[in-house]
């Protein structure tokens, strides 16, 4: 009897996980976070600034529209599991700037100034 209950519970949990699955778009991904919003950019990065100055370690990007966004460079305020992801985002933005790839949309945390990038969607 216990095996049957466990199987039913396990199947219900597994079905629940499969139903939600991985996000299929930046909009779905962004909706999983609090204090975020989507910005439709559809443009190339106009300027890329990287600062390694103490507590203000970050990358700042701007667009022709004047919109400004940041990615913090990993520092003591981040846990180890966040550091690699932040470094990848910083590297992605640098490559995007250098190759003049268009950024389609950004998901940003709007509780920081400038708004901090949580996810990015690009197009060629």
Curated annotation (Swiss-Prot):
Cysteine disulfide partners in this protein: 30-107
A GO term from the CC aspect: extracellular region
Signal peptide range in chain numbering: 1-21
UniProt-recorded Gene Ontology molecular function terms: toxin activity
UniProt entry keywords in alphabetical sequence: Disulfide bond, Enterotoxin, Signal, Toxin, Virulence
Quaternary state and interactors: Heterohexamer of one A chain and of five B chains.
Task performed by this protein: The biological activity of the toxin is produced by the A chain, which activates intracellular adenyl cyclase.
Name recorded for this polypeptide: Heat-labile enterotoxin B chain
Record organism: Escherichia coli
Upper taxonomic lineage: Bacteria, Pseudomonadati, Pseudomonadota, Gammaproteobacteria, Enterobacterales
């Amino acid at each position: 009897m216990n095996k049957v209950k466990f199987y039913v519970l396990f199947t219900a949990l597994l079905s629940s996980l499969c139903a939600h699955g991985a996000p299929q778009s930046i909009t779905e991904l962004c909706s999983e976070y609090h204090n975020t919003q989507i910005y439709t950019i559809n443009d190339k990065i106009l300027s890329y600034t990287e600062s390694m100055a103490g507590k203000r370690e970050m990358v700042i990007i701007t667009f022709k529209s004047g919109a400004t966004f940041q990615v913090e460079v990993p520092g003591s305020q981040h846990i180890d599991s966040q550091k690699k992801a932040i470094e990848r985002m910083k590297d992605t933005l640098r490559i995007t700037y250098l190759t003049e790839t268009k950024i389609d949309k950004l998901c940003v945390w709007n509780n920081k100034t400038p708004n901090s990038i949580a996810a990015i969607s690009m197009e060629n």
